[in-house]
């Protein structure tokens, strides 16, 4: 066995020489998918088109073949390199070989693992690992914790020298990280695009380390070197080679821009074109096979790029005289290959899979020896560790993730404390009399409601990290069930802290029963109920593939469970058709248990206004001539048990039954979540182009109009860009860290400058500093354009193509370019000329065929290479004076990379100045650059100057100083390796450069360029911050957003469906409300229920808003395309038509079913107020989102603001008269929901003629000699209500005679108050939208320019 120091990682320490080896055989494999080459993007109307559904039923969807008749065999110890252009089927083949077939409709042919077919191989899922291109990890975990988790789930039973599992994990972690060169990152967070962590190249190596930790005999790698510099990429290929040689691994990989150093490590090569095999055989023969066919491989070119270029007519080089003899199409190449000797020998060299049963037997024994002793004796498991050990590992990791995201935890706990303080002060010191009879159930229902709303954020959270779960499930690290149970376990301590803080504050502030047993009963029930709700919303997320559907269901469930929790409508009052929901609601059981726990054993005194009649002339204490209006009362005493029995049908005996039911629901939701995650399929499949509906594919035309001629002739002003003595410092662990050190350089018009260096040298940092994209740190030195300081218009007049291609997915290519041109070219340029220039750029970048294609997202939209071209186009249509590009060829295949550089060369030859960071360039790509700026570690310069013809100038420089380049080596790779110390004797290249003549010449040239720029008499400074007016920006962004909404049917339809369903549900819940005393309360709750349409809609709206904000902040704000005011203005205005539509639908489905007045003036007023509410909650949600750092933060903040702030103080939960004076005197009047409810409630109550049901009447006797009418005359003169029979002596009294009497208890003293409140609601809508602008302004302040001195 090899030692770790030699760079080989061997985790297989099984005894008796058991090794895991498998031969991978695939014969005549073909793959079919239903996705066509191009599809039409969905719109609001298209998804509702019945013809689509009918077509689907008929099965008329076309099929497409993405792999055809592919065969091969990879034996243990061998490495196969799969090559092909994007779309040729490389990734699809790798998915099939890794036994990941779910994303394909049909896979024909045979795939064998040893002697097993693909069905039998499923039980060895973790022995066939697939590493895809994506580097998605939990960003708040360190590299150490990420690796330890992977290894913890792969600890074999038998370990060398009796080594403990902890020592084993530690040793293997060190070996793997050392082999990949990232051992120094163990304490660094993995991070992502939002959380700072390791670099992109290091994150890629963490992904590679995770697969290596799995130690599977078959390893399938999809573009594993993307984002790595050439030296690291070659080292990784050598690591795979050692793994294959020493541990007999079977390796299959596809790589883009694979240099010759990588290519030479492989044994066999499989070349694909359009899903067909153009070559399969030994690597040594591949180049000569195509050269013999008549193709020429350029000097210094990557052989891998040459093999894939032969099928590209515009790029291949054919030997003179062979033009008519070489094949052109994929079919011709395949036919030629099948007739070759190489094909015959390859097929004859196959070991028959049927004879490889010994491999499967050895694998079965080896896997069995790995299993822990405690593993359950059942059918062979794909997992190394037992379920209990998986749960342990997942639980530890979950706690580590939470520890890394302390902010969310703190927010949860602080929110609970704030909510409890607010709620406790609302229900402060409840009295033991009938005045608290309405408040006490409110105080008990509040924790149920708050934690219901707060748990909704779990649906959002369940979609974060889903790709990680799918990947690690496939790797066999753990069952999703273990992950699910671990989540449930880690909920417990968080909920304990959260609920304890909440309960202690609320319970004692509200002065609920002062009994330890009752407090702890209250506490444990709220904890169980909270856990149950959290798990329920997590289950919703697990069972839904799309977030839109999950948020819709979440919103509906929160409304349903709120209404049927037993608080708004007691069980006996529920309509029979929805009563069953009560039994399925965990919150209903919690509320019953809390009510019984509080009321049983408690006696309340019946006092006025509930003890009737009262006032002067009536008895002041208990009397047979007075009656109590509270159900379950006897005389002037209300027995708690009798009250909850009469009003709610609750019983003391149900407390622990309810607790048991809640725990049962919790377990059920855990099982449901586990089931959803177990059935969750990994996403994948072929990419598909989406076209705008109504568009046609267009071809380039040669005819041009005079306007187009003018547009092409008018190029941007050509400028020279220089920088000198540039230093950049950032704060790091309380000190300053220098990232750039005395860097200088220049870019002239017509010059293409390459910025190169090893990984972590500061290439992107320098580009960000030069382009004014840094918002922190300190910059020193000079950055000049034409010898003058960068002006205010610099960011707008320069183009910057970032590594991440950030675009609005629903826009077409042409729309994205037109948007940029209209907003970034000066306002005085005619619109026709701008559009003509867009056409010119579309032709220049060869985008004509896809100009009407939607940009989309990877997998459903443009390919990576097409997206790069669109990014370039978006910047070019602005006519920039200078163009910056960060890694434009990263992640592309050789031909696509060549295309991008070819386009840049076109631009440069037209006078454009371009500065471009690049790594892993082939010799052909490097040849296209005019100059090179080389950075060594620490941001220090190692070279700046011309490259020369065939890169001879720069190679001579390094040769003179002791590092000559071998004849066949790629110059770019040689230069980068040399400055990293790969020379015979150590050379300090930074010092060599500082002492060189080349540096002095470059500095002299820089001074000359600056002096020439300053002397330009024609220079006119552009002082405009933005190219166009704010009004024009607003109209353009609004138009784009309206199109985006039209093409986002999921978002809009989910909002519409949520409203329609909630309205019908509410309408039939409160069906034809009557005119009894309790029916007045139902009218109030029907309106109160309408308010709860907001949480679901806000939860769905915020990710949409944040997505748009991220695009704005990542690219459009930095390029000064438009102002943040235009962004917020457009966001608010674009939603308005859909909000009015939603209000209309809700009104139509709810108002009439609930039986509200049909008078036009009343119904019209209600409709108007409902529209205002749509505006109100949307603006509040957008205000939270405008400042929130991410979706989860926003989802956690929603219940705090809506629950603590708005619902609590509007006078419904606690009526105005019973509210604490502290809140009543100011916050009640500042709460927009106060006026919202007032505007709605006054109209539907005022004219109601109340007729009490017999059960609602207060009964008492009149004194001897008096009728009820005579006895109550004084009381009725001052107070509301009526007597059923004034002439009787056994009095029956109803508390209200009209709805107006009830309305006055809610501070609606006059009829006009409802219109007054509607006007105030409108003002609150305006102020809420103003808050959105304010929040964005506060956030925008953070992104300031770094100071330059």
From Swiss-Prot:
Its main location: membrane. SMART domains: AAA. SUPFAM superfamilies: P-loop containing nucleoside triphosphate hydrolases. This is ABC multidrug transporter G. Keywords: ATP-binding, Cell membrane, Glycoprotein, Hydrolase, Membrane, Nucleotide-binding, Repeat, Transmembrane, Transmembrane helix, Transport. Gene3D superfamilies: P-loop containing nucleotide triphosphate hydrolases. It is found in: Cell membrane. The chain crosses the membrane at residues 407-427, 436-456, 492-512, 523-543, 550-570, 580-600, 659-679, 1056-1076, 1085-1105, 1121-1143, 1166-1186, 1193-1213, 1226-1246, 1318-1338. Belongs to the ABC transporter superfamily. ABCG family. PDR (TC 3.A.1.205) subfamily. Glycans are attached at residues 144, 549, 649, 994, 1287. Residues 51-299, 721-963 form the ABC transporter domain. GO terms for cellular component: plasma membrane. ATP binds at residues 757-764.
